[in-house]
Amino acid sequence: MAGQLREYRRRIKTVQSTKKITKAMELIAASRIAKARARVAASRPYAEEITRVISAVASQTTIAHPLTTERPEPTRAAVVVITSDRGLAGGYSSNALKRAGELVELLREEGKEPLLYAVGRKAGTYYRFRGRPLAGDYTGFSEQPSYSDAKAVADALITAFTTPTEEGGVDEIHLVFTEYVSAMTQNAVAHRLLPMVLREHDEPPAGGPLPNYEFEPSAEAVLDALLPRYVESRLYAALLESAASESAARQRAMKSATDNAEDLIKTYTRAANRARQDAITQEISEIVGGANALASGA
């Protein structure tokens, strides 16, 4: 009985230590959610506005830009998959990888060869384990991405998109990331990044006429400058959405782990109390039995 009681107490201490770790990780993730949400909210208007401006510029020029031109017979598509660098985030990375797998199958059915770009250590590990070649592998910034991180990935994608397919380039670029909806809801989504889909027109302000823009030095020059910024901003927004989703998923996972640890501690505590009671009962029985034996001998 004494040995069983010691084992339960050892298990309780082990679970209590684990609970401290998961609780700390839960609090850290919760503190990061607010910052990540603020960054997401700040990035969305810029991404939307640059899309609107590019559409306005493109509507006033007849020159077809490489980043907005549909390829007649696309044969190769880049798939950028954004996951986490670390684990303990529930199904966050696995859901993104599952959505990427569905997209890859769809592209193959359309006769397009998928070219994979992994953002986050989980994606890189997943594809390397399965022997899938990677055109790009980026790690180290999944939780707190910077604009320079997005630019590094965007530069590689633009280079691939502007390179002929016979020289290893791609005809399309698709982005798989996790969209942040709320602290309880995050959705793995797939969006086509390039060629950019231009809006038909702007909504007239307050029912008035559409704005008539003047561009210096020219609409074409403005388009050349803005389109790379569009790719960078869209990619940066996706990284921020994913970072917020990762923190939310990790906070939920760690809260669940903490709750499970509390339940396990209660279970072990009850078992230890029973073992202690059984040990006391046994000791009392032995004392009473010994006393009775002495009385009978007397």
Swiss-Prot record:
Q: Name one GO cellular component term.
A: plasma membrane
Q: How is this protein positioned relative to the membrane?
A: Peripheral membrane protein
The alphabetized UniProt keywords are: ATP synthesis, Cell membrane, CF(1), Hydrogen ion transport, Ion transport, Membrane, Transport
Q: Which GO terms describe its biological process?
A: proton motive force-driven plasma membrane ATP synthesis
One annotated GO molecular function is: ATP binding
Matching entries from InterPro entries are given as:
ATP_synth_F1_ATPase_gsu (IPR035968), ATP_synth_F1_gsu (IPR000131), ATP_synth_F1_gsu_CS (IPR023632)
Gene3D superfamilies to which the protein is assigned, alphabetical: 3.40.1380.10, ATP synthase, gamma subunit, helix hairpin domain
| Localization annotation | Cell membrane
Keyword Zinc part of the UniProt annotation: no
Say yes or no: keyword Magnesium present. Answer: no
What family is reported?
Answer: Belongs to the ATPase gamma chain family.
What function does the entry list? Produces ATP from ADP in the presence of a proton gradient across the membrane. The gamma chain is believed to be important in regulating ATPase activity and the flow of protons through the CF(0) complex.
HAMAP family for the chain:
ATP_synth_gamma_bact
The entry describes its oligomerization and partners as: F-type ATPases have 2 components, CF(1) - the catalytic core - and CF(0) - the membrane proton channel. CF(1) has five subunits: alpha(3), beta(3), gamma(1), delta(1), epsilon(1). CF(0) has three main subunits: a, b and c.
Query: What protein name applies here?
Result: ATP synthase gamma chain
Species this chain originates from: Parafrankia sp. (strain EAN1pec)
